[in-house]
Amino acid sequence: MNTTTSIIAAGLLFATLLPTFGSELKNFDSEKNENDTDTEQTLIDFSNTSVAAWRIVNDSVMGGISRSTLQMHEDGYALFTGTVSLENNGGFASVRTRAERPVDLSEFEGLSVRVLGDGKTYTLRLRTVKNGRLTRYSYEARFATTSGEWETYKLAYSDFSPVFRGNAVRGNPELNPDAILEIGFMIQDGQKGPFRLGVQKLSVYR
């Protein structure tokens, strides 16, 4: 499979709705993005897709009361916004999407995100498949934003650390980029109060 074909396949997979949401978005990223280059290829471009395939997961799963939403902004990007509360042992809000099957991104060096920040630090979160099963732990890499500025952050695969329920995973297993199933954004680390992150595009780079 050549590079362009593999990227189109990856884009189609990450554009597939979770089974609970409905059927596949058939035409998402079916052609190479006009801004793609030999060194960077688009996985998700919110200027030409919706947020229907994404789901919110906040600290309510452990008794917290943080709130968040993900919606499309009129200017053509996804807006992840809400309020983080530290009450009831909470302290995080997240949004994520999952492919129908693992995506092989091993020919690239890492992920690139184009975001509109608010001065807070966010986490790009990945989950992978190992031995045919989804790992219990996730892989996380952080990026510190500048308030009111569009910026692009490149996160090498080596920047991602394995984490389970906020703790480092024993043995520090390396990220396996040839079997990525889930990807998402999170705000955590005791950053209480309102937050606002615009997401324009997610790419892979070499």
Feature-to-residue mapping (PLM):
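Beta-rich carbohydrate-recognition modules and glycan-binding surfaces
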Residues: 2, 6, 19-206
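Bacterial N-terminal signal peptides
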Residues: 9-19
